[in-house]
Design a protein with these regions (language model features):
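Short glycine-rich, Thr/Ser-proximal phosphate-binding strand/loop in the N-terminal lobe
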Residues: 1-30
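Glycine-rich phosphate-binding loop plus the immediately following alpha-helix
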Residues: 20-26, 107-210
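Phosphate/pyrophosphate-binding loops at sites that engage ATP/ADP/AMP, CoA/4′-phosphopantetheine
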Residues: 35-55, 250-263
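Short beta-strand-loop/turn "lid" adjacent to the catalytic site in phosphate-handling enzymes
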Residues: 42-121, 160
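Short glycine-aspartate micro-motif
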Residues: 53-57, 144-148, 268
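Adenine-nucleotide phosphate-binding core of ATP-dependent small-molecule kinases
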Residues: 209-252
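Glycine-rich phosphate-binding/hydrolytic loop that grips phosphoryl groups
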Residues: 251, 281, 294-320
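Glycine-rich phosphate-binding loops at beta-strand->alpha-helix junctions
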Residues: 261-282
């Protein structure tokens, strides 16, 4: 994502390659070549020179051991200033001469991590940067739980002072993909996952209520029974499966709220629209949560957070 210094968005470039390649191949060559290609294309298509770009701010898995370089996690609680102060500058001359500024991930504060404290421990890379943008939009003064559905669903507690305090992760997005394309259920589902216009509230609700009465693996298999005997429409079956998985995510969200002893917390859901909609519907209709806000999908959320941290970084650096 390319931004002007005044905060206006210029352009973006995406490619289907990522840290998964590094994890599978044991080499970071693909990710480095992909990052270089995207940067070169952005510069060329925006008709600017490399020297005009002040810096490249990275968050997420690019700052992990399967990214460009691993940057240690910050220990929660952290605010945007703490994140900004922990940014580390790196140069990768095989990619570009522009300096990279690596935004660290955040981990829960847990002493003596072991099997007895495993439940308390979790980490995030990238979502803390999204949380910075969300906190800027919402403002301080209230306890918030951000729910960020995607390949993983990240549940983040930010307190009324604007500190990111704790997180919890589920793998529902990756599980949905695996179940959809790599199990027996493939025969009961459409060739591609349903789009936003094909979202079916009733089928999602059917899946969630089935999950209430069954174990996870049993509820998942009920997708096949649902398509075979209840609704032949495979798109309805896809929505049913979505409801099953998101029910268990919503269980995790409610348990997270209880663990943090948050009575008056506001839930803010931001992420892939169809998954976010399912989370919203299950939280409000089945879990009976009242203070739930569903935001429009914003693919610039992480980029907005990174730009905010870049602003602060240069401002404080100049003030030193």
């Amino acid at each position: 994502y390319l931004w002007r210094q005044d905060g206006s968005f210029v352009s973006s470039k995406k490619e289907r390659a990522g840290v998964r390649n590094t994890a599978m191949d044991g080499s970071d060559q693909v990710i480095r070549e992909t990052v270089k290609r995207c940067i070169d294309s952005l510069i060329e298509e925006s008709h600017i020179e490399e020297s005009q770009v002040q810096g490249i701010f990275c968050s997420g898995m690019l700052t992990s051991n399967v990214g460009l370089e691993e940057i240690p996690y910050l220990c929660a609680p952290v605010d945007e200033r703490a994140l900004c102060n922990a940014i580390e500058c790196r140069f990768f001359n095989d990619i570009t001469r522009i300096p990279f500024y690596m935004i660290p991930g955040v981990r829960n504060h847990v002493e003596n991590i072991g099997i007895d404290t495993l439940e308390q421990m979790d980490v995030m890379r990238g979502e803390e940067t999204e949380a910075v943008a969300l906190l800027r939009e919402r403002g301080k003064g209230e306890d918030l739980i951000f729910v960020l559905p995607g390949s993983h669903t990240k549940i983040i507690y930010a307190n009324e002072e604007g500190y990111i305090c704790r997180c919890k992760t589920t793998m529902s997005g990756e599980l949905l993909d695996a179940l959809f394309f790599h199990t027996l259920l493939k025969d009961s589902l459409p060739d591609f996952f349903v789009g936003e216009e094909e979202y079916d509230y009733q089928a999602v609700s059917d899946g969630a209520r089935t999950a209430q009465k069954n174990s996870f693996t049993s509820a998942v298999f009920k997708t096949r029974i649902y398509q075979k005997y209840v609704h032949k429409d495979k798109k309805k079956a896809a929505n049913f499966l979505l409801g099953v998985l998101m029910y268990y995510d919503c269980l995790s969200i409610c348990e997270f709220k209880k663990t943090e002893a948050l009575e008056e917390v506001q839930f803010v859901i931001a992420g892939k629209r169809i998954i976010a909609q399912a989370v919203y519907d299950i939280l409000t209709d089945i879990m009976q949560e009242k203070k739930v806000h569903l935001l429009d999908e914003d693919e610039l959320m992480a980029a907005k957070g990174a730009f905010r941290l870049a602003e602060l970084y240069y401002k404080w650096k100049e003030g030193e």
